[in-house]
């Protein structure tokens, strides 16, 4: 009995052929096979994606510059759930901003990673919108919104809500222009 089989031997035995299509192999390629991003629908959509990526890069660099102070800032927002939620949210924000970049910059990644990256781009704008609404509608005496961490103070107000909506529009426009799911013909 040969205990060490090659990957091609294993693939031959685990590939299901349905209507002439290699189902298992085709469906599993979404996880591991890096592919190039398809061309954007318009030049403007590509430029919007680059602009949103530049904004996220500035955000994440300034937030990571003083990450411990960024977490303390989120803690001062008095979010429901207290300190653990603030720390978790801070980590989710930074990780989402970083992982949204492969989709926006059209990097060569697997199709699944491209979809996850696109969704994280939406999540970033949604989190910032919720935080902006929370700080604007509650009576928290906070002097910094946190877009740029604690490096540059940006006072919360309705402008932060509008800016967060603008981030959502950029994410939606980039998603429309760089839509990663190909149609079957």
Where do the language-model regions lie?
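Membrane-interface interhelical connector segments
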Residues: 65-84
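Extended, low-polarity transmembrane helix blocks
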Residues: 1-65, 69, 91, 95, ...
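Interfacial helix-start motif at the membrane-water boundary
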Residues: 80-96
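Residue-level detector of alpha-helical recognition elements and their boundaries
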Residues: 75-76, 85, 116, 144
């Amino acid at each position: 009995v040969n205990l060490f089989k090659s990957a091609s031997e294993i693939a031959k035995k685990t590939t299901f052929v349905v209507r002439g299509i290699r189902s298992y192999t085709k469906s599993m390629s979404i996880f591991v096979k890096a592919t190039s991003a398809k061309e954007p629908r318009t030049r403007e959509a590509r430029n919007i994606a680059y602009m949103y990526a530049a904004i996220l890069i500035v955000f994440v660099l300034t937030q990571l510059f003083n990450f411990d102070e960024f977490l303390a800032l989120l803690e001062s927002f008095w979010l429901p759930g207290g300190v653990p939620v603030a720390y978790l949210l801070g980590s989710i924000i930074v990780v989402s901003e970083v992982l949204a970049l492969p989709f926006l910059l059209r990097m060569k990644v697997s199709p699944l990673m491209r979809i996850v990256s696109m969704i994280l781009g939406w999540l970033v704008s949604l989190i910032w919108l919720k935080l902006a609404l929370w700080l604007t509608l509650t009576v928290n005496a906070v002097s910094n919104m946190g877009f740029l961490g604690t490096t540059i103070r940006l006072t919360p107000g309705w402008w932060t809500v509008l800016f967060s909506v603008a981030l959502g529009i950029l994410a939606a426009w980039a998603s429309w222009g760089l839509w990663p799911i190909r149609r079957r013909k």
